[in-house]
Each structure stands twice: as structure tokens, then as C-alpha cells.
A protein has these predicted regions:
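P-loop NTPase switch/coupling surface
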Residues: 1-151
Length: 151
């Protein structure tokens, strides 16, 4: 998986209206900033986003837009536009579109899919989520551990 774009629109902790357009030519991204600037909160926000997509029964944690690619050659692009304001159920709150990379090197027109199609099946498989999500926090805190427990 490669995250291409993240826009946290509504406030998540101290992160407000933050846009990150990740360099799609690099596989590594480094977040650098002063203490208290929100680096760890960005990582936690991503964990909360993928947790909601993975479980499928949680409301959108905040308003955001996320674009990421899956596959060894980034052959699928998934775009998620989510907000608690879009409706009262998790399915209404998540607008998801998928594009497929064609032989010409161009992505197809996006196809809308439901959150229920993204969520993992009983065997833990999903065509629209990464197989693994890893996060590391180097502080004396279990803030991320609690988010991973249901998985």
C-alpha cells in the first residue's frame, strides 16, 4: 500500500484542515516537526481511518479524504471521502471510489463501492485494504495499542 493523499478536514485532536500530498515517486515518507505539532496525531488518525474501514461498523472518526494505492504495481487506487455529516450510518458516512490501472498506464474512471464491500470478510481478506498495517510510536504510551486490539 502507498498512501498518496490525506486531508483531515475537521479537527482530530490538534490537527485541523491538514493536507498532505505524499510524493508518489518515493516509497518512504518521514514526518518531521516540533514536539506537539501533530506528527503522532497524523499517524493515529491514519490508524483510526483504517480501523473504521477494516471493521466497517464504526462511524467515520472525523471528516477526511484519503487516497491510496494497492498492489505491487499500484494497480488499484482507492479514494475515501468520509464525514460524520454525510449520514447516520457508517455506510452513509463513507463515499468510496476505486480506479484500476489499465495497460495504457492510465487509471479507469472511478467506480463507487459501498463500505460493506471494503470491509474484511470472515477470513480476513479484502480487495480494497492493505494486508497489514504497521504503526510505531516511540513514546511511553499505549495510544496506538488500544486501536489495534480488535484486529
Amino acid at each position: 500500500m502507498k498512501i498518496d493523499y490525506l486531508h483531515i478536514r475537521s479537527g482530530f485532536k490538534n490537527v485541523q484542515d491538514l493536507e498532505i500530498d505524499f510524493d508518489n515517486r518515493q516509497l518512504l515518507t518521514v514526518l518531521i516537526g516540533r514536539n506537539g505539532s501533530g506528527k503522532s496525531n497524523v499517524i493515529e488518525a491514519l490508524v483510526r481511518i483504517f480501523r473504521a474501514l477494516d471493521l466497517g461498523d464504526e462511524p467515520a472518526p472525523f471528516s477526511y479524504k484519503l487516497s491510496y494505492s494497492l498492489g505491487s504495481s499500484s494497480d488499484r487506487r482507492i479514494e475515501v471521502d468520509a464525514s460524520p455529516e454525510y449520514g447516520s450510518t457508517p455506510i452513509q458516512q463513507h463515499k468510496i471510489q476505486v480506479s484500476t490501472l489499465g495497460e495504457s498506464g492510465q487509471y479507469s474512471l472511478p467506480e463507487s463501492i459501498s463500505l460493506s464491500k471494503v470491509t474484511r470478510d470472515k477470513e480476513g481478506n479484502s480487495d480494497y485494504l492493505p494486508k497489514h498495517l504497521f504503526a510505531y510510536y516511540s513514546g511511553p504510551s499505549d495510544r496506538l495499542e488500544d486501536l489495534f486490539k480488535p484486529h
